[in-house]
Regions:
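Class I S-adenosyl-L-methionine
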Residues: 169-224, 257
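Class I SAM-dependent methyltransferase SAM/SAH-binding core
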Residues: 53-98, 103
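Class I SAM-dependent methyltransferase Rossmann-like catalytic core
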Residues: 1-32
Length: 263
């Protein structure tokens, strides 16, 4: 799927093309194939530059049932809407593409939505707001269909490990973790590069134990699974948070506030 308007910064086209090669490797490593008409959630999506490649990889016949991107910032969501209008994508029909402003780390809803087959968080920002990202990941896991996959990419090795540990404590099972050998180095921070690591997670067979939002986490909530419970369709989905600014890559914000000036 081609963008309706050009990307905002030099280098993004090549970054997205490389992500399009990395994602299929991750899906194969995770031993997962998307359903014929997947529902896809892109959390803390910023300008959502990766929308086209997500739809190309996960719904190559244009049969995505629903694609939703959520971010805290109005300007970035406005740009995403302009770049990725809903349009015929192939013999499968028309993908329903939507972008919303919201913060998934906080209580609140953006309306009744289905559960999702694939949830993506690109360039997660765990170490800027660990508590907020803990809440965001918890909400993401409650929105994930049984058998679905949650994927994250990271700028930094250490931040990737922190996010991975958080998801494991929440009850997610790690199914793949790939370094990106062609990751483009960024110069605004040491050791930072575009989509440096890709990790995929699933719900455990009997479902993660998730404490209600706002309740103090206990050891059981952090580590112990409980018997399976249904994840109902039509749940009111929480709103997504932002991530950290980037140099020449799609900007993200932390889940609670802007970190620096985006450019």
């Amino acid at each position: 799927m081609r963008p309706a308007i050009p990307f905002s910064y030099p280098g993004i086209d090549a970054d997205i093309a490389r992500l399009g090669s990395l994602l299929p490797l991750g899906l194969r490593a995770a031993e997962w194939a998307p359903p014929a008409a997947p529902a896809i959630l892109n959390l803390a999506c910023g300008r959502a530059d990766e929308t086209g490649v997500l739809l190309d990889v996960l719904a190559p016949l244009g049969a995505a049932r629903f694609y939703l991107g959520i971010d805290l910032r109005d300007p970035e969501i406005a740009e995403a809407r302009a770049r990725w209008p809903a349009a015929p994508m192939g013999p499968g029909g028309v993908a329903e593409i939507e972008f919303r402003v919201g913060d998934a780390s906080k209580p609140g809803t953006t309306g009744l939505l289905p559960d999702f087959d694939f949830i993506f968080v690109r360039h997660q920002n765990f170490w800027h707001e660990p508590e907020a990202w803990n809440r965001l990941y918890r909400r993401a896991l409650t929105a994930l269909k049984p058998g679905g996959r949650l994927a994250i990419t990271s700028y930094f090795e250490r931040e990737h490990e922190l996010a991975r540990a958080c998801l494991l404590q929440l009850g997610a099972a790690a199914v793949a973790d790939l370094p990106h050998p062609q990751s483009r180095r960024l110069t605004d921070a040491p050791g930072k590069s575009v989509d440096r690591r890709l990790a995929l997670f699933r719900l455990p067979e009997d479902g993660p134990r998730l404490a209600p939002i706002g309740s103090p986490p206990t050891a059981a909530h952090r580590t112990t699974p409980e018997p399976s419970r249904p994840i109902s369709s039509g749940r009111a989905l929480p709103r997504a948070g932002p991530a950290q600014p980037e140099s020449g890559a799609s900007p993200r914000m932390s889940a609670l506030h802007t970190v620096g000036q985006l450019g």
